[in-house]
């Protein structure tokens, strides 16, 4: 009985072998798709991706418990508007008395320097013929010729007054300027209320004169006094221009 199925299989195999030998390929029809398999195990982590864009800032956090250290000082601001003056304070206590001038060494040194500078200046001007010294008086001229009133103003601005001789030595010193500039000069005398009565600028009578022969002869019309190149005097109208000579 078992030989019949076996013979059938051999026949089928022989027939199949004949077909395969001819085409060398066994072609079957596609089967029906099977059911999906179960999920496999999770795979390994992939590589890191590219860096993304920064996200938006988060909300401000709560204040910290530790205070921050103070920052550096800022730049100075612009000056403010000056305030109103305060009330005058009470006078301070009276200071100790100063030393007498002759005991103050610093003051004496300063005065010594001043004297030295003055003497140097006087010496330099004397060499130039700009000043003449007689006793305690210093006579000086700038060589300009102006009216009597203008000379008085110029000498006052310089801290002196118009030159006036009170003795022969001073008269000779003034005459030296008259000779140098070869022009007459006014002296500090003016005629008083009475004709021919000439006085000093302070109104005191003249105690020294050197009038030219026959002078004064203006009889009240010539109220100033000019000096000639020989040192003699003549009364003259005050509106003429004469050499400026001052005394200090």
UniProtKB/Swiss-Prot annotation:
Positions glycosylated per UniProt: 207
Keyword annotations: Acetylation, Calcium, Collagen, Disease variant, Disulfide bond, Extracellular matrix, Gaseous exchange, Glycoprotein, Hydroxylation, Lectin, Secreted, Signal, Surface film
Subcellular location: Secreted; Secreted, Extracellular space, Extracellular matrix; Secreted, Extracellular space, Surface film
Record PTM 4-hydroxyproline, positions in chain: 30, 33, 36, 42, 54, 57, 63, 67, 70
GO biological process terms held by the UniProt record: opsonization; respiratory gaseous exchange by respiratory system
Stretch forming the signal peptide: 1-20
Extent of Basic and acidic residues compositional bias: 42-51
Protein origin, superkingdom: Eukaryota
CDD domains (UniProt xref): CLECT_collectin_like
Disease cited in the entry: Interstitial lung disease 1: A form of interstitial lung disease, a heterogeneous group of diseases affecting the distal part of the lung and characterized by a progressive remodeling of the alveolar interstitium. The disease spectrum ranges from idiopathic interstitial pneumonia or pneumonitis to idiopathic pulmonary fibrosis, that is associated with an increased risk of developing lung cancer. Clinical features of interstitial lung disease include dyspnea, clubbing of the fingers, and restrictive lung capacity.
Function: In presence of calcium ions, it binds to surfactant phospholipids and contributes to lower the surface tension at the air-liquid interface in the alveoli of the mammalian lung and is essential for normal respiration. Enhances the expression of MYO18A/SP-R210 on alveolar macrophages. (Microbial infection) Recognition of M.tuberculosis by dendritic cells may occur partially via this molecule. Can recognize, bind, and opsonize pathogens to enhance their elimination by alveolar macrophages.
Similarity comment text for this entry: Belongs to the SFTPA family.
Name by which UniProt lists this protein: Pulmonary surfactant-associated protein A1
Protein source organism: Homo sapiens (Human)
Gene (UniProt): SFTPA1
